[in-house]
Amino acid sequence: MLKSTDLKNESEMSRVKVLSEALPYIQKFTGRKIVVKYGGAAMRDSNVKDQVMRDIVLLSCVGIRPIVVHGGGPEINSWLGKLGIEPQFKDGLRVTDASTMEVVEMVLVGKVNKEIVSLINQAGGCAVGLCGKDASLIQARPEGIEGIGFVGEVSNVKIDILQSLVDNGYIPVVSSVATDEQGQAYNLNADTVAGEIAAAMEAEKLILLTDTAGILEDYHNPDSLIVKLDIQEARELIEKGIVSGGMIPKVNCCVRSLAQGVRAAHILDGRVPHVLLQEILTDTGVGSMIVA
């Protein structure tokens, strides 16, 4: 006869087993920096959002040093609509004129960033919100594409403020807005910002949370997930058109960060519950991992 106490004991043993399996990974990554680009459905679904924040806090509590980088495209579109500004895109990039740039900065720095900071702190962490302007963290330059306005790319990363924060147990949360040498604000791709910060901070891992299982050989077949590949294989997938559309800048930023010393880059499905913990603290791992 199976009693309820037996089920309870089995459940408790299962939890203990999970914790035991996590131990070698906690030991391996304690003190190491991991940069997480937070975006996609993980930002839109309140349940997933809470899980991601709690997972980030857990990683911090076991001695791993997470740095969060975020965008906020849907939120920007929503506020542009409220203000009667029609969102415009060119070759997948947001056309960012002066009025749009004001909204981008207001939403990313003043709203989305502070919401993430608040959620992490509510979950028991100690987060500090930043943008590229703070302590000259990121210097931007124009993207160089005609007709897209104040869309920029990363020119330089000055890590002093991030290093100070992580060394003292804080969780930095960085929004993808920065200025050039003249003080002009630019809208930056959050994936690219995450990759450049990971490289500058000599991070152990760069993790991009997306709305897909990872890199797929066949976009229409989730079972065609490529679990592990190296830089050369990643470049070949782009050349062959297997990696296309919005996945190209994600793979490119992973490749660039690896070339600058990041140990591993991961593209994960942010919709999967506790995907960060599965990737970092278990034997199985999830999503696609790119290595040098």
Curated annotation (Swiss-Prot):
Task: Indicate where this protein resides in the cell.
Answer: Cytoplasm
The molecular function terms of the Gene Ontology recorded here are:
acetylglutamate kinase activity; ATP binding
Cellular component terms per the entry's GO annotation: cytoplasm
Known SUPFAM superfamilies for this protein?
Carbamate kinase-like
Q: Which InterPro entries does the entry mention?
A: AceGlu_kinase-like_sf (IPR036393), AcgluKinase_fam (IPR004662), ArgB (IPR037528), Asp/Glu/Uridylate_kinase (IPR001048), Glu/AcGlu_kinase (IPR001057), NAGK-C (IPR041727)
In the Enzyme Commission scheme, what number(s) does this protein have? 2.7.2.8
The feature of type site (Transition state stabilizer) is located at: 37, 250
Q: Which reaction does it catalyse?
A: N-acetyl-L-glutamate + ATP = N-acetyl-L-glutamyl 5-phosphate + ADP
Q: Name one Pfam family in it.
A: AA_kinase
User: Where mainly located?
Assistant: cytoplasm
Kindly report, in one word, the top-level EC class recorded for this enzyme.
transferase
Query: Which residues does the record give as substrate binding sites?
Result: 72-73, 94, 187
Keywords of this entry: Amino-acid biosynthesis, Arginine biosynthesis, ATP-binding, Cytoplasm, Kinase, Nucleotide-binding, Transferase
- Role description: Catalyzes the ATP-dependent phosphorylation of N-acetyl-L-glutamate.
NCBIfam families attached here? argB
Protein name as annotated: Acetylglutamate kinase
Q: Which organism is it from?
A: Trichodesmium erythraeum (strain IMS101)
Print the organism lineage: Bacteria, Bacillati, Cyanobacteriota, Cyanophyceae, Oscillatoriophycideae
